[in-house]
Amino acid sequence: MNNTILLIGNGKLSKSLQPLLKNYIVFVFDENNITELKKYQGSILIDCSLNRAFNYIYDYLKNFPTKTIICSTGHSKKQMNQIKELSNLMPIFKSENFSLGISLINKFIKDNKKIINRYDNYIFDFHHKNKIDSPSGTSKLIMSSFSRSPNVFSIRTSNIIGSHKINLFQDDEEIEITHKITSRNVFAKGIILSIDFILKKEKGFFTMEDLLNEI
């Protein structure tokens, strides 16, 4: 890869990416220096922030269209519309979870919606006690794959990176799907796959579902 990267955010996800992309990162921005973003340009912008930097990123991309990967969650409807607007000018890849495993689970649910509707559906999401959003962005992503909204329960405890359990109940049977993260490297690897994907695109809005269809 012969490209330069602007990395927004300096939290756990960003730190897992930095060793893997150290030869390509031009600068790492956080809430203390995000105002400096306009002074830099790169081939790719990766947003790993907590969404507090959105306005700076939006203004930057309007002036400097850049292939963009959005890993942050919790965007408002207005912000999502702004992201879609930007995707008319440049490729934007967005996901609440960059794990291929979660993408496979979502595909299974979408492909079998009619049958799954016959079950009572539940999602349980487990994360570390400092996790801010509840339910998690991943739970919301999984919820969007159902045609009928499942019941969601969020548990925040200990130092769990991330675990999601989907239960489908009928009178005489139960289906359980569990996805557990044991290392944040799984997200970093997914982001690197999305970099390879987005480098081939000129504009448009893309998700892990699009990436999965091209693997």
Residue ranges: model-predicted function:
Residues 70-72, 94-95, 122-126:
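Short, conserved beta-strand edge motifs with alternating hydrophobic and charged residues
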Residues 38, 55-62, 106, 110, ...:
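Amphipathic, non-transmembrane alpha-helical secondary structure
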Residues 37-39, 44, 48, 52-71, ...:
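Rossmann-fold NAD(P) dinucleotide-binding segment
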Residues 52, 72-94, 100-103, 108-112:
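Rossmann-fold NAD(P)-binding glycine/threonine-rich loop
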Residues 21, 61, 84-87, 116:
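A generic structural signal for well-ordered alpha-helical segments
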Residues 58, 80, 105-106, 135-139, ...:
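Conserved strand-to-helix beginnings and helix N-cap segments that scaffold or border functional pockets
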Residues 4-39, 117-215:
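C-terminal substrate-binding/catalytic lobe of Rossmann-fold NAD(P)-dependent oxidoreductases
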